[in-house]
Amino acid sequence: SLNAEEMIKKEEHLTASLEERIRAAAAARDNGSPVGFHIHPMIWHKGWEEGYAHVVSLIEKNFSPSDICMISFGTLTFTKAVLQHLRTHRTPSRVLEIPLEEAAGKYSYSLDIKKEMFSKVYSFFSEEFKKEVFFYLCMEDPSLWKPCLGREYSSDSEFEADMKNAYFRKIRDFVS
């Protein structure tokens, strides 16, 4: 799981830094394992574009597309109970500063904000990465796929089959 360094420092307390996460993934790759990255939970904040552009630059600097099975994007989503807990306990967090909308009993960003974030971060990747790495949206509204990643699926099973095929192809190439 990767995030912008500022979000790791301010929101993901007691976790590895971005650099440590990249080094750990590189060590796994060096030991013969393909890797995958979840850029998740993406958090809308001042300077988010620069923060996530840096994440992408570290991925591309330290890995080739052949090293990576998949990269997913996802945003912060809360249940009502978690959001109430944060507010009543006055947990210091930038998360409470963001505009959240209710959808399917949970709270998250609007589709417009998600579309902007996913499209922008995807655009930071080189064409080589876009062509050779399987990108997907993790548990996000299906209407976001086409405008953000340029493709869509007619069903969950179609997505799952495409993802499995991409994984197996990458793993086969990795061990060859």
Feature-to-residue mapping (PLM):
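Conserved AdoMet/S-adenosylmethionine-binding subsite of the radical SAM
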Residues: S1-A104, F124
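Auxiliary Fe-S-binding modules of radical SAM enzymes
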Residues: E60-S176
